[in-house]
Amino acid sequence: MSTNASDSPVLSLLIPIYNVQRYLRECLDSAVAQTLEDIEIICINDGSTDSSPDIIREYMERDARVKMIDKANSGYGDSMNRGLEMARGEYVGILESDDFMAPDALEKLVSAAESCNADFAKANFDFYWSKPEERRSLHEMFKPKDCGKPVHPSDTTQFFKQKPSIWSAVYRRDFLERNGIKFLPTPGASFQDTSFAFKVIACADKAVYLHDAV
């Protein structure tokens, strides 16, 4: 596994963080273990008052790909926009700090986007329970007939009706920048993922969906 930082990585993975010490190590473990190694992992610490910043620094010492934006609390939208400003990758991915991803998640998503020359690639995902016993359940937003081929997402309303799940996708950074797609910076604003996902679908010329959960 490569732990070296690249000046122009394939993908920038944004992780917004606020008081998630309980879950953060599992999240970061899944990020640094990605089979797509040419990534930068941008941790945006939104004024955490627990041990989250110390955990981030611990991973920064072990892996040069891990970086931190350490700032006063300003909310999810501003945090994500700060991450987008720092991103240098050809693609942008998002990982919520209380979540984790399959080891090959980013590799699958980027490969699909590349093969279809898509503005974004998006996959199904699993619901996960750790108690009373570990189990997973596929949330099938996209049926096999809709997957693995380029589509124009705004041609049908079905894709606007799916869960936003902005973290089960990768986006071409130049596509986001050309279309001015950002998050609402207003502190406390709700449904940030919904507005971001809507703008992505409305602006994209081409997308590809994956049936596999990531």
Protein language model annotation of sequence segments:
Residues 1-214:
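Nucleotide-sugar donor-binding/catalytic module of glycosyltransferases
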